[in-house]
């Protein structure tokens, strides 16, 4: 996923989370906000792992998102917050979980 699609700044994360629009599952939480372009940020709480492991999981998630084709057509900013259960899954299960959540997100935003 290209860098232009990443959310990096803390105030951007906070603005999206404070909008309180969300899709929740057992392993992930998606907060979203309408925007004219697609952007995504991944957040893993500090108490789950050290910095090296958190960055590893973020890279895994970005690799999964890179494989999903129709993401850039979405006109939303999304903050993905990872829960502890998600980190125990293997790569293919993580990919299925993210795809399932994105489908739920697409269905939710149509309502």
UniProtKB/Swiss-Prot annotation:
Signal peptide: none annotated. It catalyses: Endonucleolytic cleavage of RNA, removing 5'-extranucleotides from tRNA precursor. GO terms for molecular function: 3'-tRNA processing endoribonuclease activity; ribonuclease P activity; tRNA binding. One of its GO terms (cellular component) is ribonuclease P complex. The keyword Ribosomal protein does not apply. Keywords: Endonuclease, Hydrolase, Nuclease, RNA-binding, tRNA processing. One of its GO terms (biological process) is tRNA 5'-leader removal. The keyword RNA-binding applies. Its EC number is 3.1.26.5. InterPro entries: Ribosomal_Su5_D2-typ_SF (IPR020568), Ribsml_uS5_D2-typ_fold_subgr (IPR014721), RNase_P (IPR000100). Transmembrane segments: none annotated. Consists of a catalytic RNA component (M1 or rnpB) and a protein subunit. Belongs to the RnpA family. NCBIfam families: rnpA (TIGR00188). RNaseP catalyzes the removal of the 5'-leader sequence from pre-tRNA to produce the mature 5'-terminus. It can also cleave other RNA substrates such as 4.5S RNA. The protein component plays an auxiliary but essential role in vivo by binding to the 5'-leader sequence and broadening the substrate specificity of the ribozyme. This is Ribonuclease P protein component. The gene is rnpA.
